[in-house]
Amino acid sequence: MTDTNLSSIPAYQKLKTLRSLLLRLHKALLDAERDSYERIHGRIATKGEFFQLVIGDPWFEWLRPISQFIVQMDEVLQAKEPVSPNQIHTLLARARDLLPLSETDPSEAAVRYQRARENYPAIASMSAEVTNLLDLAPTGENLNP
């Protein structure tokens, strides 16, 4: 299946939109965590040092599943081989479990994600966009078939 054929599939378009939203949300979450990290540990001097912290420091560990998921989406969206609709639907299903949206979830990832949503309006807005795109309405209603 070529990209031209895939681009007519609503799920493919949803995945492309999700990738863009998650990339922006991920950057905003990284920036928020950098601010928090620097308040405690001091200024991060270089982009290289920040990159090393992001990939190796426990402080940023909760964000790594989002990073890895973005890479997986890129692999599917940029695949030279045909991509099945099942692959796309599987990624969309995994995305629904990716973000710790529950305010009652006691995990560190959920607590930090909720804190970021509360402290940064842009993160709250992007989170809402992802939630709406993935049909994760708080009421449990599926807005799109």
Indicate residue ranges for each PLM-predicted region:
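Surface-exposed peri-terminal alpha-helical interaction modules
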Residues: 1-145
